[in-house]
Amino acid sequence: MNYTIYDYLGLFFLYAFLGWLLETTVAAVRKKHMVNRGFLNGPLCAIYGITAVFMTRYLYELQSSPVFLFLGCMIIATAAEWIAGHVLERIGHGKWWDYSNKKWNMDGYICLQYSVLWGILGVLALKFGNILGLTLLHLAPNGVMHITLWILFGAVSYTHLRAH
């Protein structure tokens, strides 16, 4: 399938929001109060959006092979999580998550348990989430969708650059 820049932007915002929702919900249940798990201003967890776009771009040809698709999603998500963990520790001056107490962890940033989970979520996203997300995105007239995506992109970029 040929994706446009607008498809990729739409998928980025969709998965960044869903990732934020997942992270915030899990943290709120564990801590029994609201915790904003986003790194960007607003309800977004960029690692989810970036990883989903990367998977969409580079794993499309594996759609017909569930095992290889799962392995590809697992590898990409795990690599993204490991890199993001180190980057966020350097620029955020602290660990945003710590899997040190989990079996088969590396640097406390990745572990086999979550790598398998990311692989499963990646397969679900590529098999079902992208279709649903892009169908909803394309319900809006092209001009409205394009302007909205660029405004969102500009707002996130501006607030991120101002914060750093």
Where is each model-derived feature located?
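Hydrophobic, lipid-facing residues on alpha-helical transmembrane segments of integral membrane proteins
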Residues: 9-25, 46-54, 58, 71-83, ...
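Functional transmembrane or membrane-interface alpha-helices that line membrane-embedded catalytic
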Residues: 3, 30-67, 88-130
